[in-house]
Amino acid sequence: MSTKDLFAEPNLKQITVWARGVVMNKDARDIVVALTEAAAKEGKYVQAWENYVDLPDRIYVPVRAYARISSDPIESKYIYENETPDIVVLVEESLIKGVPILKGIRPGSTLVVNTKRSIDTILEFLGDTGNLAQIVTVDANSMAEAVMTLSGAEGATDATGIGAGIAAPIAGAVVKATGIVDVENLAAVVKNPAAMRRGYAEAQVRQLPPHEAVEEAAVSATELLRQMPFAGTVPSPVTENEGMVTGNWRIQRPIIDREACTECYTCWIYCPDSCITRTEEGPVFNMKYCKGCGLCTAVCPSGALTNVPELDFKD
């Protein structure tokens, strides 16, 4: 039996929350915990956990947290990932670029994005919406200030409580669009119910036209090996790993003003990822691997570099 067969539970709802490593792990965790705590108050069966198999937990790397909610006992509780999510949540808007956020979604699924941009803009980056039935946007950053705490290390119970930062309004937007739990039960478990209610009230929801689902073709792994130049061998990259493109960790990118640049190459010296090349035209940035750390902008003595939000660019 495949894992997809294990997930054939009609009353099970799967929620996948995408966030950025280290700096946003807690927000993703708070969202899934808030939703499952609210569901538990309604007598439902729940699970909430985080995924550490994507990539090493580094700053800005795409990471996931999961929730499962059902009115029946969850039979597939030992499956580590949500392979067919019903609800996908993006804690940070640039995750819509270069990250397979819609992989495996079920027909009728919902996408919730924390952004101040329009739904039309989000659709431009999505391209094929697949099985999505609705898109939701909520400007959670303007609704609740992030709370800093010294209460403990990563993974510890945080004294600020569930949903103290942007998680509360995002969770409110999820409930508005899906009704997965009662909004009053959600208000009872978040630290900032006012922010949650604002997210619930102000979230923008758009229904999408029906999309004919496309069944994934089942391909034998053995057959794929036989199609390679030499059966049984796996080609390895010579100069770079195409599967490890770190540019999708970026939430902002450096933009250079050539007129202001003095070609001192201080940025080239300080770049921790060797993404800057010295050329006759001045510094050139490799956006395929630039993580948008902002160090080059910080050390530029002439102010020729500016950090610009990643979603301002279509490439």
Swiss-Prot record:
Binds 2 [4Fe-4S] clusters per subunit. Catalyzes the anaerobic oxidation of oxalate using a broad range of electron acceptors, including ferredoxin and the nickel-dependent carbon monoxide dehydrogenase. Does not require coenzyme A as cosubstrate. Enables anaerobic growth on oxalate which is used as energy source by the bacteria. Its EC number is 1.2.7.10. Optimum pH is 8.7. It comes from Moorella thermoacetica (strain ATCC 39073 / JCM 9320). Its cofactor is [4Fe-4S] cluster. This is Oxalate oxidoreductase subunit delta. The keyword Cell inner membrane does not apply. Pfam families: Fer4, POR. GO terms for biological process: oxalate catabolic process. SUPFAM superfamilies: 4Fe-4S ferredoxins, Pyruvate-ferredoxin oxidoreductase, PFOR, domain III. Residues 252-280, 281-310 form the 4Fe-4S ferredoxin-type domain. Dimer of heterotrimer of one alpha, one beta and one delta subunit. It catalyses: oxidized 2[4Fe-4S]-[ferredoxin] + oxalate = reduced 2[4Fe-4S]-[ferredoxin] + 2 CO2. Coiled coil: none annotated. [4Fe-4S] cluster 2 binds at C271, C290, C293, C296. Keywords: 4Fe-4S, Iron, Iron-sulfur, Metal-binding, Oxidoreductase, Repeat. NCBIfam families: OxalOxreddelta (NF045790), PorD_KorD (TIGR02179). [4Fe-4S] cluster 1 binds at C261, C264, C267, C300. GO terms for molecular function: 4 iron, 4 sulfur cluster binding; metal ion binding; oxidoreductase activity, acting on the aldehyde or oxo group of donors, iron-sulfur protein as acceptor.
